[in-house]
A protein has these predicted regions:
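Short, compositionally biased
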Residues: 147-163
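Conserved small/polar residues in nucleotide/adenosyl-binding loops
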Residues: 202-211
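Intrinsically disordered, low-complexity, positively charged segments
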Residues: 45-91
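Short, basic/aromatic beta-hairpin or loop at an interaction surface
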Residues: 103-115
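Acidic/negatively charged segments and metal-coordination signatures
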Residues: 1-45
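Acidic/histidine-enriched ion/cofactor-binding microenvironments in catalytic or ligand-binding pockets
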Residues: 47, 112-145, 210
Length: 212
């Protein structure tokens, strides 16, 4: 955590209010949680109201792009075409595709088809067929603020097994989101997802690249 400041100093969050009437009680609670051995966020990870609004503005582009993909995705389309739509629409709206050129990644989006778990590379050689399921993972930067979301799409006639996978995954995500609340733990979200999916599937993907 940050160095202790005086109670009458301006709060570290930038609100202009005195620390004692702004984040002092918050920091005291964080300190108690840290003392119990839990990992706690540093001040720079805690966003104020203005920063949250800027993240929401970034997310508006991100969601608009996914909505456009939902309208246009179809059998016979290549995943490279999806990448172009994402790049064109994101930049037209004033944003930057976050994956593009990140550590050399040459695409604006990740496209994962069927049994590809995540972070697939778009390609003109990957043509969507009836029966495919595809995850389109989209991330946007707007004025330095990031947003990130993905969406699953079913192409044409999808088998009951694949449809079940998509439906269970969506419901599991919603169960996890129910646990996103002030002073909750990320582990609560993961546990809710695990518990729900375990009812439908005996095998879970236990290890994968994570977002910190």
């Amino acid at each position: 955590m940050s160095k202790k400041i005086n109670r009458n100093d301006p709060c570290w969050c930038g609100s202009g209010r005195k620390y004692k009437v702004c984040h002092e009680m918050f920091d005291d609670k964080i300190a108690k949680i840290a003392h119990q051995g839990h990992i706690v966020p540093t001040h720079n990870l805690i966003k104020n109201a203005e920063q949250i609004e800027k993240i929401k503005e970034s997310a508006k582009i991100n969601i608009a792009v996914l909505d456009e993909i939902q309208k246009t995705i179809h059998e016979g389309m290549s995943t490279a075409e999806i990448d172009k739509i994402v790049y064109d629409m994101t930049t037209d709206m004033g944003g930057i595709p976050a994956p593009l050129n990140y550590e050399g990644f040459p695409y604006s989006v990740c496209t994962s088809v069927n049994d590809q778990v995540c972070h697939g590379f778009p390609s003109p050689d990957v043509i969507l067929k009836s029966g495919d399921i595809i995850n389109v993972d989209c991330s946007t930067i707007l004025n330095g603020y990031f947003s990130d979301s993905s969406r699953m799409f079913c192409i044409g006639d999808v088998s009951p097994e694949k449809k079940k996978l998509v439906d269970v995954t969506k419901e599991a995500m919603l169960k996890g989101l129910e646990q996103v609340k002030p002073w909750g733990f990320l582990g609560d979200m993961g546990q809710a997802v695990h518990d729900y999916v375990s009812v439908s599937y005996t095998h879970l993907r236990a290890h994968e690249t994570r977002h910190d």
